[in-house]
């Protein structure tokens, strides 16, 4: 019998993944499309992913699907082809290849939610057919030469800290819901300029551009495929990569290196550093930037208090 969930402890699954010696490809995709029976769709997709030994995190809702997954490299093309041809809602999805293929996931988690991306707004404003105009890497570089363009980073502030475009502005909050709440007022002085939004892979900018268009902004654009596709395409096309630092990702890798520039500081000693870690104290698990010196000094913890808590 196939269980449509993980019945093994996380540590066991992680150890199994570490020692399986399977080369993997990390990809992401999303699609805003109406899914009539999300639970039924979820169970069918889970069976297929299980068959292909795919790990990752997938959210499904009536409004669509959002997936970050790790596929065995030797069956990557076969798996993507079968997945996209077996389900009508996945036809023509844009698959975003990660910028590096270090181990990203060791377990498959697939959940049905109210929304694939929570916006916490009181009105149903989102129309996937009325979003910002998509820009290629070349388009982005050209538009950034124009002083009328305003580049807006729609990621959380902790993501922005370790990597961003030089000219980008960012609402200093830690959730997308907060960003949407503040963004219209934040951009009110730029309403007559060209607004270019970007995020990690594009999903947040679909809603963000739709929201500001709903609120009267006219010249609204978004980077197609987000940072990931921009960097990959710019490298392939030998364009200047204008994103600097690291691209924060929500998996075991924590980040992808785009350039050698270090834009942030250690949260404990304030020396240059862009390495995110979680506090070793499981009751804290705080996400913070920590250099090697402080990692040793504080024993992988975010504070002396957390380290002393572990000793009790």
UniProtKB/Swiss-Prot annotation:
Pfam families per record: Rhodanese (PF00581), Rhodanese_C (PF12368), UPF0176_N (PF17773)
Annotated SUPFAM superfamilies: Rhodanese/Cell cycle control phosphatase
CDD domains: RHOD_YceA
Keyword DNA repair recorded: no
GO MF annotation list: oxidoreductase activity, acting on paired donors, with incorporation or reduction of molecular oxygen
Domain of life assignment: Bacteria
GO BP, one annotated term: tRNA modification
Disulfide bonds: none
Enzyme Commission designation: 1.14.-.-
Keyword Transcription: no
PANTHER family, per database record: TRNA URIDINE(34) HYDROXYLASE, UPF0176 PROTEIN YCEA
Protein name: tRNA uridine(34) hydroxylase
Organism: Buchnera aphidicola subsp. Baizongia pistaciae (strain Bp)
Taxonomic classification: Bacteria, Pseudomonadati, Pseudomonadota, Gammaproteobacteria, Enterobacterales
């Amino acid at each position: 019998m196939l269980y449509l969930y993980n019945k093994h402890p996380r540590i066991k699954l992680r150890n199994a993944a570490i020692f399986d010696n399977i080369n993997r490809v990390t990809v992401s995709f999303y699609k805003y499309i109406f899914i009539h029976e999300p639970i039924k769709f979820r169970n069918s997709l889970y069976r297929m992913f299980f068959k292909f030994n795919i790990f990752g995190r997938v959210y499904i809702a009536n409004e669509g699907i959002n997936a970050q997954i790790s596929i065995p490299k030797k069956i990557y093309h076969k798996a993507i082809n079968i997945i996209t041809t077996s389900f009508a809602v996945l036809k023509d999805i844009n698959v975003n290849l990660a910028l590096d293929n270090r181990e990203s996931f060791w377990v498959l988690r697939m959940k049905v939610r109210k929304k694939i991306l929570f916006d916490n707004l009181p009105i149903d404003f989102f129309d996937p057919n009325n979003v910002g105009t998509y820009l290629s890497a070349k388009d982005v570089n050209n538009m950034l030469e124009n002083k009328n363009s305003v580049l807006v980073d729609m990621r959380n502030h902790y993501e922005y800290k370790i990597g961003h475009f030089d000219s980008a502005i960012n609402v200093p909050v830690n959730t997308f819901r907060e960003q949407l709440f503040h963004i219209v007022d934040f951009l009110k002085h730029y309403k007559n300029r060209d607004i270019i939004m970007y995020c990690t892979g594009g999903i947040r900018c679909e809603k963000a551009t739709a929201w500001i268009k709903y609120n009267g902004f006219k010249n609204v654009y978004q980077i197609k495929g987000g940072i990931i596709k921009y960097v990959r395409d710019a490298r392939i096309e030998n364009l200047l990569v204008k994103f600097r630092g690291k691209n924060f990702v929500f998996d075991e890798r924590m980040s992808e290196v785009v350039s050698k520039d270090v834009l942030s500081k250690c949260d404990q000693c304030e020396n240059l550093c862009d390495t995110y870690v979680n506090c070793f104290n499981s009751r804290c698990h705080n996400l913070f930037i920590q250099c090697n010196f402080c990692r040793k000094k504080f024993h992988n913890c975010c504070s002396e208090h957390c380290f002393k808590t572990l000793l009790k």
